[in-house]
Amino acid sequence: MDLHNIREDYSKQELSQAHCHADPIQQFEQWLEEAITAKANEPTAMNVATVLDGKPTSRIVLLKEVNPNGFVFFTNYQSRKGQAIEQNPYVALTFFWAELERSVRIEGRIEKISAEQSDNYFAGRPYTSRVGAWASNQSQVLSSKSELVAKAALIAAKHPLHVPRPPHWGGYIVLPERIEFWQGRPSRLHDRICYRLVEGAWHKERLSP
């Protein structure tokens, strides 16, 4: 399959270092709001990259909260990503909003949020999603789809109203140490503004594309 001639020439906007917020979290929130306003497809979807036994893996996960400390998502702690995080608590996140010709890359340390925070989020999930969190042994081999459906039915019968949060399911927060904002530009002269956390303070700089 020849893909040599598939390319886009970006030209919608530019990114000025002077106009970027001093705090990259605020800059991210602005870009995320603009992606939502522009009706970007799945604006909160992000690639989460981890390393397990020295080998990188990645998957798409939905961002569920941004706060001054970092970026929060929820998952099964016993999943492959959970095992990787337990072994190596450093991850990378990537957002891509094609509609705005923008990308954000985030690198940092990851840790679990409190059980209370996970409980509060889990309680607000749809009933079927709460059942699914119990039914799925995420990343484990299934003999058939019917096995999963049957297990979900049993859990629903056991918990017809209130489904408690599984102890192996909850939230993580990524505490950023490096955040890069990328804006596509003509002739591949893209804008890249990078923030690095140095001794507790954010340093902002422009990178060559």
From Swiss-Prot:
Pathway: Cofactor metabolism; pyridoxal 5'-phosphate salvage; pyridoxal 5'-phosphate from pyridoxamine 5'-phosphate: step 1/1; Cofactor metabolism; pyridoxal 5'-phosphate salvage; pyridoxal 5'-phosphate from pyridoxine 5'-phosphate: step 1/1
Required cofactor(s): FMN
Cofactor binding comment, as recorded: Binds 1 FMN per subunit.
Molecular function via GO: FMN binding; pyridoxamine phosphate oxidase activity
Keyword Oxidoreductase: yes
Residue runs in coiled coils: none
Presence of keyword Flavoprotein: yes
EC id: 1.4.3.5
GO biological process, alphabetically ordered: pyridoxine biosynthetic process
UniProt-listed Pfam families: PNP_phzG_C, PNPOx_N
Catalyzed reactions: pyridoxamine 5'-phosphate + O2 + H2O = pyridoxal 5'-phosphate + H2O2 + NH4(+); pyridoxine 5'-phosphate + O2 = pyridoxal 5'-phosphate + H2O2
Binding, substrate: 7-10, 64, 121, 125, 129, 188-190
Quaternary assembly: Homodimer.
Function: Catalyzes the oxidation of either pyridoxine 5'-phosphate (PNP) or pyridoxamine 5'-phosphate (PMP) into pyridoxal 5'-phosphate (PLP).
Family stated for the protein in its record: Belongs to the pyridoxamine 5'-phosphate oxidase family.
Name this polypeptide is given: Pyridoxine/pyridoxamine 5'-phosphate oxidase
Gene that encodes the chain: pdxH
